Design a protein with these regions (language model features):
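Short loop/turn motifs that connect adjacent beta-strands in outer-membrane beta-barrel proteins
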Residues: 21-24, 65, 113-120, 183-185, ...
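Short glycine/proline- and aromatic-enriched beta-strand/turn motifs that initiate or cap beta-hairpins
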Residues: 22-61, 254-270, 297
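Residues on the lipid-exposed face of transmembrane beta-strands in outer-membrane beta-barrel proteins
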Residues: 29-31, 56-60, 105-109, 125-127, ...
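Outer-membrane beta-barrel proteins
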Residues: 36-42, 78-83, 131-137, 187, ...
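Extracellular loop and loop/strand-boundary signature of outer-membrane beta-barrel proteins
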Residues: 39-45, 88-96, 158-164, 245-248
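Residues that define the transmembrane beta-barrel architecture of outer-membrane proteins
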Residues: 48-52, 99-103, 119, 168-172, ...
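Gram-negative (and chloroplast) outer-membrane scaffold detector with strong preference
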Residues: 65-148
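Outer-membrane beta-barrel transmembrane domain signature
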Residues: 128-253
């Protein structure tokens, strides 16, 4: 994911510096909270299961109200049934954690002209490519990656309706935020961004429980142990039937970020390439309101 985006970013910066010289270019960092919504967590506002996200970005303004952003986010997502308020889901006793890397490209529309007004709300939307790999911890505290265990017998000839899922997918990011231009060169902001994915396996949970004996022969004892973990809470809890609901495939998983952003404009910053000077941005931009004169009588 990162290699692909870096190639295109470097290509744009070094092949087209003259085309960008009259436009405003910001670079920055971001950090905040990451969340997930899916079969293990239906509530998008659960702060107790939030995790961290950090990122870097570049933002180009071809027009005062319109900008194009590209960047990378590095996050962690996760959830556990033990925090669920529903008794039947707590009894399921599943959990997962996943590191998530994302590269994205979005289009942002500001409500106000950033060259005239220091503070402006905005909305954005775009496309992203992300990689994840869910894991959990067994009863001995050992970290176990779930994809290779095929906990729902993905890929088994006995379950053709359960195909293996991919660890690299695309999503549709969208959301909004607010930006405050502290000076001509520095901006800070807050953003809430949702990611609509097209997979139901961020949490490794999607459909029904596979037959216990079939799963044992296909994937081994460790897969059986981590497919159903209710017996860890109640030793007399039986393994569910092959028609038992483990997840809901009708609803895809989501992830989203709530971040604070810090940006620096490259206006007035020049560098040499092949003996020529290049620069980015409008060095004469001023972030000030128009003066309003008092009426005369």
């Amino acid at each position: 994911v990162i290699k692909v985006y870096l190639r295109y970013s470097i290509l744009v910066l070094f092949l087209f510096p003259n085309a960008l010289s009259s436009q405003e270019l910001f670079i920055g960092i971001s950090g905040g909270l990451s969340n997930y919504q899916g079969d293990l967590l239906n509530n998008i506002s659960t702060l107790s299961q939030s995790r961290a996200v950090g990122g870097m970005y570049a933002q180009l303004y071809p027009f005062p109200y319109l900008s194009i952003s590209g960047g990378f986010n590095f996050a962690k997502i996760g959830a556990a049934d033990k925090f669920n308020v529903q008794p039947d889901l707590r009894a399921r006793n599943l959990s997962f954690v996943s590191n998530l890397q994302e590269g994205y490209l979005t289009l942002q529309i500001d409500f106000f002209n950033y060259e005239r007004i220091k503070i402006t709300p905005y909305i954005f939307g775009g496309v992203a490519l992300f990689h994840y790999n869910p894991y959990t911890y067994d009863t001995g505290g050992e970290k176990v990656f779930l994809h290779s265990l095929t906990t729902e017998a993905q890929g088994s000839p006995d379950y053709p309706e359960h195909p293996p899922y991919k660890l690299t997918n695309y999503s549709l990011p969208f959301g909004g935020g607010i930006t405050y231009h502290v000076t001509q060169l520095i901006s800070v902001g807050a953003q809430l961004g949702f990611r609509k994915t097209f997979t139901d396996y961020l949490d490794d949970v999607s459909t029904t429980y596979p037959d216990q004996e079939t799963l044992l022969q296909y994937a081994g004892q460790k897969s059986v142990e981590l497919t159903f973990r209710g017996d860890e809470l109640n030793s007399s809890a039986p393994y569910p039937s092959s028609t038992g609901v483990r997840g809901d495939p009708n609803y895809k998983d989501w992830y989203y970020f709530t971040v604070i952003k810090l940006g620096v404009s490259l206006s007035g910053i020049h560098f040499k390439t092949g003996g020529k000077n290049f620069g980015y941005g409008n060095t004469q931009r001023k972030l000030s309101k128009k003066k309003i004169s008092c009426p005369k009588f």
